[in-house]
Amino acid sequence: MCNRANANKDGVNNMMYLSKGLAVQKSTEEFRVSHCGKVFALGPEMARLWTNAQQAPKEVPAGKENYIRRLEQSGLAGTTKERGDLAHYRLLSGCIICPELDSDTKPVQTGYDGRIWTWIEQAGLRLTASELIRLEEQGTKPVPALLGEQGRQELTEQIYSSKELIWDGTLESEMERSPARDALVMSLLRLLRMGRLFWCRGGNGCETGCL
């Protein structure tokens, strides 16, 4: 399904990275990114690297590893040494997906992407890529009973209907092998390129910070 990263000429594995957070101020003098209730001011090089992977996973540029590590330590990027489809999944699986409701692009209403967008926009909790894959694997549709505040508990029970999936990391590991994985990841990447999404890392308090 994918190939491991090949070592470059210096023997260092290339990494892929994906930016997290939402740009809230862009100017020649200052670039600010909001993430989980905090605002970070980025210098020119950090801003360029963050913007580079804002709408799609990118390879870490040679010589920029320390910059990317600083972004990752601040929660503004995720990295992986995997390649291809698995790299995309690994980068997305640990993120909470947040809808960009102020986007200038047209709403996504039909087809596969429309269904995924409905979950992201209308579910009573912020979903992860792994949870969306689980819903697709089950063939679960975004019906009114599973949406909004009133559907939060039922939706959670639907996703975690198997008690084994409750343990940390179990769902991510299981969905990595799901036949529904690649289609869902590609849908998320399309929505990301359209400016409909931004990413937030997991963790206590993070969900509220993204709303």
Identify the residue ranges that each predicted region occupies.
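Long, charge-rich, low-complexity alpha-helical segments
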Residues: K38-L211
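Short, positively charged and aromatic/hydrophobic N-terminal segments
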Residues: C2-N6
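Short, amphipathic alpha-helical interface elements at domain boundaries
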Residues: D10-Q55
